[in-house]
Amino acid sequence: MREHARSPDLVGRVLNALHIAARMLASIDEARPSRGDDPGIRGFQATYRDKIVAESAMLVLCAKGAAHHDRRISECVDAVIGPINRFARSEQVVSALCVDPGRALEHAVAHIILGRLGYPDAKLDQLLSLCHASGAGVGPERLPHRQLEQQWLARLWGGAHRPDHGERSILVQSMLGRTLDAFGSSRLDVYAFTHALMYATDFGDRRPRLPRKLSAIVLDAETALAFALDTDDLDLVAEVLLTWPMLGLPWSPTAVFAFRRLTAVADERGFLPGYNFVAAEYDKLTGDEQRQYALVTSYHANYVMGFLCALALRRGGTLTDSVSADRRYRGAAAALIDLVDDAAETLAWRRQFDALTPDEQDRVSPLLLAIVLRRAKNGGDMRVVQHALAVAVKHDLCGSPSAVQAAALLRRGQFLVGYFADRATERGSAVNVAVE
């Protein structure tokens, strides 16, 4: 998976993702039944094959918009269009549309994207129209971000004239309509956040009326980055970083730091390790087996890296943040890093952090605050929560979701202490009465 991974520029990383897509699509032809859904096991389930084809089409959709930056992007896009077309319009897809009309748009993701890119298939469009109409009243219950996906696919398929019924209500119910839980959110919560934004914005090509201010959504994205970086979930880091180019916003210091982390790992390994990647398993393998393991466990992370770099190119390609740290932040990073426990030296992101200048470290102090507070809360260490909030007050970092929610946590903790103290007093009084 090395092809272009060592290229320092965004174009090289887009090319790398497209080369990986070509290899993944070629692997489908060699698919054999696997032992379950684990993508680390050789072979692909039918649903996994559909996922690869759909995500490959999404990668092409993003990369096509950046093709004017380098002719090699167009060449790589053209190389994968053919295999995508073959799978997107196969007999299996036709059968799935007819048998499962309630999920017609999901079955036709790659077909719809190809049509949008100028590769139509009128006959399959006719069948899709029939099946989609038949399935309108059936199909699965969908979470808000999946409802937004349906609207995104409808827009791609039908163009700008197709209305988005109830979009505002769906956005309000989605993760874009509420503050992310800085301490209790899971990977799936962050996934719902990133995908709601992908679909609502058409991967950055559309500006919907969002239910909250952009600044609030960006704060949530930075909170999500703290979680993803601290768990070393680089696939998720890349997804969250899509927030900035999709909203057309300059990259924040936290976002730039996270991107540096991704590129450092990708350049060291030759690919970006995915969520299912286990270094110990990878290191046991050699040759083709090792390359296949890296490909199948990490293709998605590298696709998302391709999305990210393509969208960044479309927005001008500037990732470097040159703004000096606010004077109020000076010294915040040193104070916060001291609050991380003895495992600090083994933190996955620590090497990138230590490579920063003191001024750069202070610029990412909101990220450090979020990491420290989440670790302290989940470890039950309210003393560290208090100390971290004291640093936040001193350096004017109190506006982040992590700080606000940590302060609320301490207030609830004080109530709990008083509640149990009162209960203990009541029990003591009851014992005295019984003795008397």
List PLM regions with ranges:
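Terminal, non-catalytic domain-edge segments
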Residues: 1-66, 130, 135, 174, ...
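An N-terminal, globular interaction/scaffold subdomain
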Residues: 29-116
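Compact integral membrane and secretory-pathway proteins
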Residues: 40, 81, 105-107, 111, ...
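Extracellular glycan-recognition/adhesion modules and their associated mucin-like linkers
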Residues: 45-49, 237-241, 245
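Core register positions within helices of long alpha-helical scaffolds
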Residues: 59, 110-113, 153, 199, ...
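Amphipathic alpha-helical protein-interaction segments enriched in hydrophobic
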Residues: 231-242, 296-304
